[in-house]
Amino acid sequence: MTQSQALRVGIGGPVGSGKTALTLALCRALRDKYNIAVVTNDIYTAEDAQFLVRNEALAPDRIIGVETGGCPHTAIREDASINLEAVDRLNQRFPGLEIIFVESGGDNLAATFSPELSDLTLYVIDVSAGDKIPRKGGPGITKSDLLVINKIDLAPMVGASLEVMDRDARKMRGERPFIFSNLKTGQGLAEIIAFIETQGLLRPHAG
């Protein structure tokens, strides 16, 4: 491949929605096909980075944990310098890097990624928060490149209707795509990967 900028994929969503589970699943599925690295954001610890290292998502030097302090959404939006610096470090450390996943700290529905930091944005919400979440809107729901509605297996337990979520997601997002997933079993993962590869114009190769 010619030397070019890595595709930066932002992964956002509320606390507990499945962002780190998605990051782990993507790393495991794509690490033999692409040259990849990860930046995670946590408020005061590198907990998500440690989780990914512990679960052998990638080699430890391919994962940088950024401690944002204060409001995690500031570090991905208003002042993304700490994340941009981590991305630069990874690009220098691994020439020919093809994908960098940037996982935000737990944030609210109003948080979005700065265009400086992310080429593609995935926003993860989960069914256990109730079927009203899509209609609450916010930039993550309405403007992300792909909305991932995770933990669909919990719908019967929390009395959430996937039909309602489907209808509201279509209404709030217009033409923008969304996917139902259960990352615990891998349901929806192939579609998420296909989206990243297609939108990111990626060409897989054997590792």
Swiss-Prot record:
Ligand binding (GTP): G13, P14, V15, G16, S17, G18, K19, T20
Pfam families cross-referenced by the UniProt entry: cobW (PF02492)
GO biological process assignments: urea catabolic process
Keyword terms: Chaperone, Cytoplasm, GTP-binding, Nickel insertion, Nucleotide-binding
Protein's UniProt keywords contain Amino-acid biosynthesis: no
Localization (cell): Cytoplasm
Statement: the UniProt record of this protein carries the keyword Secreted: no
GO cellular component terms, semicolon-separated: cytoplasm
Gene Ontology molecular functions: GTP binding; GTPase activity; nickel cation binding
Functional description taken from the UniProt entry: Facilitates the functional incorporation of the urease nickel metallocenter. This process requires GTP hydrolysis, probably effectuated by UreG.
Binding partners and assembly: Homodimer. UreD, UreF and UreG form a complex that acts as a GTP-hydrolysis-dependent molecular chaperone, activating the urease apoprotein by helping to assemble the nickel containing metallocenter of UreC. The UreE protein probably delivers the nickel.
Protein name: Urease accessory protein UreG
